[in-house]
Amino acid sequence: MSGNTLGTLFTVTTFGESHGPAIGCVIDGCPPGMALTEADVQLELDRRKPGTSRHVTQRQEPDQVEILSGVFEGVTTGAPIALLIRNTDQRSKDYGNIVETFRPGHADYTYWQKYGVRDYRGGGRSSARLTAPVVGAGAIAKKWLRERFGVEVRGYMSALGEIEIPFVDWSHVRENPFFAPNADIVPQLEGYMDALRKDGDSIGARIDVVASGVPVGWGEPLFDRLDADIAHAMMGINAVKGVEIGAGFASVAQRGSVHGDELTPDGFVGNHAGGVLGGISTGQDITVSIAIKPTSSIRTPRRSITKAGEPAVIETFGRHDPCVGIRATPIAESMLALVLIDHALRHRAQCGDVSTATPKIAARAPQAQ
């Protein structure tokens, strides 16, 4: 199986399965000399881990990270960094009814047809459990970006099903299990999720991610454009079915006189481009939105087929998130950070000594605030 590595200079290769003994990743290309401890990584993993509220899977995984290599006396050495997270709460018996039957909406059918073998326990390699090592790697990328460039990568849930969540303040995000930027709407979200669970159904979500402080110049046209790599990484997250950069699909209804972000000596007048022009960062906030589909594992009986091609009706048991989007915010943040650190290193390698006489303008002109 190929396709398990993300990045060019800063690469992340994940390994493991949902019900195997452990999951993890190997990070190659991390610059040496950065202070790093397991506690730095654990902070991010704790934001993603399961069992933290009644609205997510009740699989109780501590997601305790172990750094096996690449760090000596608390400092990165430049050698590959191996992160290991042991699985401790597998319950494989919950999946006995799908050994011979494919779950609708899951990767069961496609993995079987492609590889001729399938780990049915929790989806095996296709499980969202594998986003944990991504978040671990993202913690390292975030730390380097913040310390080296002052870049901050933050995200929030902007919609849960048909409920739009107006942005109020970043401080609200860390105060509720939905990563909602509006504390007043949390009771409505909780009631919505309780009703879904009672119905044995699920729902999707939209997550917005913002990277602030990214300097102008990151991105490698034509085919390694910054926005192209962001979209590629975001689509690598389980259940993501859509990605927008900046105004995204709303650009269809915008006139050029509106969408084109004007430049003034004092800064950009708008940011419909989402901080990327021509595949290169503009120095503005990089804004990304992802659409996450409803969880496919639900208790509602649905039609399927067996390995023999016979019709079947399947009801999924086990401990599943009624909305995988609830825990997706730190995952999306990590994916964006991994793309940014990779492009920061690529830019430094080729264009680190390039300078022009044109001043770098502000991300947003004062009159546009």
Swiss-Prot record:
NADP(+) binds at residues 48, 54. It catalyses: 5-O-(1-carboxyvinyl)-3-phosphoshikimate = chorismate + phosphate. PROSITE patterns: CHORISMATE_SYNTHASE_1, CHORISMATE_SYNTHASE_2, CHORISMATE_SYNTHASE_3. Signal peptide: none annotated. Reduced FMN (FMNH(2)). Keywords: Amino-acid biosynthesis, Aromatic amino acid biosynthesis, FAD, Flavoprotein, FMN, Lyase, NADP. Its cofactor is FMNH2. Pathway: Metabolic intermediate biosynthesis; chorismate biosynthesis; chorismate from D-erythrose 4-phosphate and phosphoenolpyruvate: step 7/7. Pfam families: Chorismate_synt (PF01264). GO terms for molecular function: chorismate synthase activity; FMN binding. FMN binds at residues 125-127, 238-239, 278, 293-297, 319. It is an enzyme of class 4 (lyase). It comes from the Bacteria. CDD domains: Chorismate_synthase. Its EC number is 4.2.3.5. The keyword Manganese does not apply. GO terms for biological process: amino acid biosynthetic process; aromatic amino acid family biosynthetic process; chorismate biosynthetic process. GO terms for cellular component: cytosol. Homotetramer. Belongs to the chorismate synthase family. This reaction introduces a second double bond into the aromatic ring system. This is Chorismate synthase. The gene is aroC.
